C-alpha cells in the first residue's frame, strides 16, 4: 500500500500477508498474518483455517460511521453461520463456527521444518517449529526419537493451550536439553488444559527448574520421566511458583539442585499422584522442597532421596 499521509487506511479483522512488521499491524485490532488455508482453488476456507470466526460485525469509516458486514457471503449463504457466532474472514462463510483443532506431527529423524506438519508423512523436524505453525488448542504429536538442539528446548508455551504427546511412550521419546536450558517454560497463565504426556526429559539445566519451569501457570503432566536434570537454584527437575499443576504416573530419578533435587514449590497447590521419586539430591538435603503452598503426594514412592523439606 502506498497511501499519502492524509489518506484514511483502516484495517480490522483481516489477513495481510507479510504485514507483521508494518507500523499499523496490531493483533488487538484483528490484524493477522497467517496462512488462510484455503480448501481448494475456489478459495473456500478449509475446516482448519484460523480465518473461521475471526471477523467482526462492523468497521468505522473515516467519518466515524459504522459499515456493517453483509448478511450473506459470495454464494448467498447466511453470514455469520451459525447465527450469533462471529463471521469468517474472506468472501466465503464456512459451515463451522470455529476452526477444527489440528494435530501437528514432529519427527526428528525424518521431518522437515518447511513441511506443513499435518500428517505423519509431512511432519516437521523440531518442536519449536510445531509451536510456530500450531494454534491455540492444537495437538503436537512427537514420533519416537531423541529431540535435541536449540529448537527442542526452552520452549515457551506463550499462554496458549496445547496438548503435547507421543504414541510411542517415554522410553523411546526423549527431549535431551544438553544442559543448555529447560525443556518447557510456563510463565503466561497457561491453564490446566495444557497437557504434556509420554515424554522423557533429560539433561535439563536452569536456575529454576532444570527440566520444567512454571510461574503462575497450571499445566498437567502424565506418564513422564524426568532424569539427570539439574538446577543451580531451585528444582532439579521441576520448579513451580504460584502453580496449580499436577503430575500423574511420573518418574523423577537422579535429578539435582541446590534446593529441591526433584521438585521445588513456592506457592500454589500441586499434586504428585502415582509418582516414583528415586535418588534425587540437593545441596540443602531436600529431594522435595516446599517453600510455601500446598503439596499433595498420593499413591507414590519416595526412595533413596534426600529428605523432604517443608510441609507436605
Tell me what each language-model feature is:
Residues 1-48, 60-63, 75, 83, ...:
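Predominantly extracellular beta-rich ligand-binding scaffolds that present long acidic/polar faces
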Residues 12-18, 88-91, 138-142, 164-166, ...:
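Extracellular beta-strand repeat scaffolds in secreted/surface proteins
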Residues 21-26, 45-92, 96-98, 198, ...:
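Active-site and glycan-interaction determinants of carbohydrate-active enzymes
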Residues 33-37, 160-206:
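Right-handed parallel beta-helix/beta-spiral solenoid domain characteristic of secreted/periplasmic
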Residues 35-40, 94-129, 146:
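Right-handed parallel beta-helix/beta-solenoid
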Residues 50-58, 89-110, 128, 132-139:
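Extracellular "leader-to-stem" segments immediately downstream of a signal peptide or signal-anchor
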Residues 136-162, 169, 173, 306:
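N-terminal extracellular ligand-recognition/capping segment immediately after the signal peptide
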Amino acid at each position: 500500500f502506498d497511501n499519502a499521509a492524509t489518506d484514511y487506511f483502516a484495517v480490522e479483522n483481516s489477513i495481510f500477508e507479510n504485514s507483521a512488521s508494518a507500523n499499523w499491524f496490531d493483533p488487538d485490532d484483528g490484524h493477522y498474518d497467517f496462512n488462510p488455508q484455503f480448501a481448494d482453488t475456489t478459495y473456500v476456507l478449509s475446516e482448519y483455517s484460523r480465518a473461521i470466526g475471526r471477523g467482526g460485525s462492523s468497521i468505522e469509516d473515516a467519518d466515524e460511521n459504522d459499515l456493517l458486514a453483509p448478511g450473506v457471503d459470495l454464494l448467498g449463504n447466511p453470514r455469520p453461520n451459525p447465527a450469533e457466532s462471529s463471521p469468517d474472514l474472506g468472501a466465503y462463510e464456512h459451515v463451522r463456527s470455529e476452526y477444527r483443532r489440528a494435530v501437528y506431527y514432529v519427527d526428528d529423524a525424518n521431518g522437515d521444518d518447511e513441511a506443513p506438519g499435518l500428517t505423519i508423512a509431512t511432519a516437521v523436524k523440531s518442536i519449536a517449529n510445531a509451536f510456530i505453525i500450531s494454534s491455540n488448542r492444537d495437538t503436537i504429536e512427537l514420533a519416537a526419537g531423541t529431540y535435541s538442539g536449540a529448537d527442542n528446548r526452552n520452549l515457551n508455551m506463550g499462554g496458549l493451550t496445547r496438548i503435547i504427546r507421543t504414541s510411542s511412550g517415554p522410553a523411546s521419546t526423549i527431549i535431551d536439553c544438553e544442559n543448555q536450558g529447560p525443556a518447557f517454560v510456563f510463565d503466561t497463565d497457561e491453564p490446566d488444559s495444557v497437557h504434556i504426556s509420554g515424554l522423557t526429559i533429560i539433561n535439563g539445566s536452569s536456575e529454576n527448574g532444570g527440566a520444567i519451569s512454571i510461574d503462575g501457570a497450571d499445566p498437567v503432566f502424565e506418564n513422564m520421566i524426568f532424569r539427570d536434570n539439574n538446577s543451580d537454584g531451585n528444582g532439579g527437575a521441576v520448579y513451580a511458583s504460584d502453580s496449580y499443576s499436577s503430575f500423574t504416573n511420573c518418574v523423577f530419578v537422579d535429578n539435582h539442585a541446590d534446593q529441591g533435587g526433584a521438585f521445588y514449590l513456592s506457592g500454589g497447590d500441586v499434586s504428585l499422584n502415582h509418582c516414583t521419586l528415586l535418588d534425587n539430591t540437593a545441596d540443602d538435603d531436600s529431594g522435595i522442597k516446599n517453600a510455601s503452598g500446598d503439596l499433595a503426594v498420593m499413591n507414590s514412592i519416595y526412595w533413596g532421596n534426600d529428605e523432604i523439606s517443608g510441609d507436605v
